[in-house]
Amino acid sequence: MTTVSMRDMLQAGVHFGHQTRYWNPKMKPFIFGARNGVHIINLEHTVPMFNEALAFISNVASKKGKVLFVGTKRAAGEAIKEAAISCDQYYVDHRWLGGMLTNWKTVRQSIKRLKELESQSVDGTFDKLTKKEALMRTRELEKLEKSLGGIKNMGGLPDVLFVIGADHEHIAIKEANNLGIPVVAVVDTNSAPDGVNYIVPGNDDAMRAIRLYTTSVAAAAKAGRGQDLAVQAEQDGFVEAE
């Protein structure tokens, strides 16, 4: 089972919150104190809460569930994308489009258009167009890929959202809440934990902290998927009893 230790979190700077003047009182239970005007997050809470969240994500993945990684802040985008791809899951790393979950029918049409344009770009269709028309379609393809590339193969709504920065991604969290999709989110001292099912109190800006969260969630999803494949193989008669 994937777990993260106190040492891992200390080394990554998970405990450093925001300046005290920007705090959200709803995060008070998770704050240890303050140092040099910066809130210090109590890792005695964060360690078990994150490990509980990892166990939940692993369980979702073990049932063929879809995990959607969400992190559109500049610091989080790259790590979110890499982690999601590494565990064969899905991501939104650029901008959360309003209705991405609650208006899935429309999003599905945009994904269909994206796939059409992808096919046209490789089957020679673009070469037969005028220069202007080809350029317009290329731009449309790039725009759609940027917005929807990480969810184009999701094939339906996700089973869990993993979010870096609850404050920044409040629209995504609200949409998930409306649809009853569980949310795991890193919540810093300046944010509200509202609508988050699995709260991970921690720094949501430092690259090392973000990498720790994303790689751990990816490992948990992979481990869960591995359990699913092992069970499937056993059912199919591929695993011999010792």
UniProtKB/Swiss-Prot annotation:
Keywords carried by this UniProt record: Ribonucleoprotein, Ribosomal protein
SUPFAM superfamilies cross-referenced by the UniProt entry: Ribosomal protein S2 (SSF52313)
Molecular function terms from GO: structural constituent of ribosome
Highest taxon above the source species: Bacteria
Pfam assignment, any one: Ribosomal_S2
One Gene Ontology term, aspect cellular component: cytosolic small ribosomal subunit
GO BP field: translation
NCBIfam families linked: rpsB_bact
Family: Belongs to the universal ribosomal protein uS2 family.
PANTHER family: 30S RIBOSOMAL PROTEIN S2 PROKARYOTIC AND ORGANELLAR, SMALL RIBOSOMAL SUBUNIT PROTEIN US2M
Name recorded for this polypeptide: Small ribosomal subunit protein uS2
Organism: Shewanella sp. (strain W3-18-1)
Gene that specifies this protein: rpsB
